[in-house]
Curated annotation (Swiss-Prot):
Part of the 30S ribosomal subunit. Contacts proteins S9 and S11. Transmembrane segments: none annotated. GO terms for molecular function: rRNA binding; structural constituent of ribosome; tRNA binding. One of the primary rRNA binding proteins, it binds directly to 16S rRNA where it nucleates assembly of the head domain of the 30S subunit. Is located at the subunit interface close to the decoding center, probably blocks exit of the E-site tRNA. It comes from Shewanella pealeana (strain ATCC 700345 / ANG-SQ1). SUPFAM superfamilies: Ribosomal protein S7 (SSF47973). One of its GO terms (biological process) is translation. Keywords: Ribonucleoprotein, Ribosomal protein, RNA-binding, rRNA-binding, tRNA-binding. One of its GO terms (cellular component) is small ribosomal subunit. PROSITE patterns: RIBOSOMAL_S7. This is Small ribosomal subunit protein uS7.
Length: 156
């Protein structure tokens, strides 16, 4: 626990094209080595491709994809009397979004398409239809939490 004041969450500026804070956060997750303009190009191209294929609005596809990837529970390691238990815990809303975005990007990076924009578009389309690697990751995390439900009383 901090002895002084608790530091609040920083306000994030919405992205320039769609005026969405969620999209601005996603751009920051994609960004590598501080190259924000490159990350923006990748995201906007991916959203254009995805909305062209599905025929829906850009932000609707992104929101649907993130909804299907967001975890509601996860497991945390907790050491009790010499043995380590995987204790299921609820995930806070901010962390839910962060994990969903991170998993989407990781899954997209592992795909086989030519460019990152195409990989991301493919993964977002898959996730919006409740399939794909990112959704599988969420299901694995939920399965782990379900399997370790017996240790839920060790929560802190």
């Amino acid at each position: 626990m901090p002895r002084r004041r608790v530091v609040g969450q920083r306000k994030i500026l919405p992205d320039p094209k769609f005026k969405s804070e969620l999209l601005a956060k996603f751009i920051n997750v994609i960004m590598q080595d501080g190259k924000k303009s490159t990350a923006e190009k990748i995201i906007y191209k991916a959203l254009d491709t995805a909305s062209e294929k599905k025929g829906e609005d850009h932000l609707v596809i992104l929101e649907a994809a993130l909804d299907n990837v967001r975890p509601s529970v996860e497991v945390k390691s907790r050491r009790v009397g010499g043995s380590t238990y995987q204790v299921p815990c609820e995930v806070r809303p901010v962390r839910r979004n962060a994990l969903a975005m991170r998993w989407l990007v990781e899954a997209a990076r592992k795909r086989g398409e030519k460019s990152m924009a195409l990989r991301l578009a493919g993964e977002m389309l898959d996730a919006s239809e409740n399939k794909g690697t990112a959704v599988k990751k969420r299901e694995d995390v939920h399965r782990m939490a379900e399997a370790n439900k017996a240790f839920a009383h060790y929560r802190w």
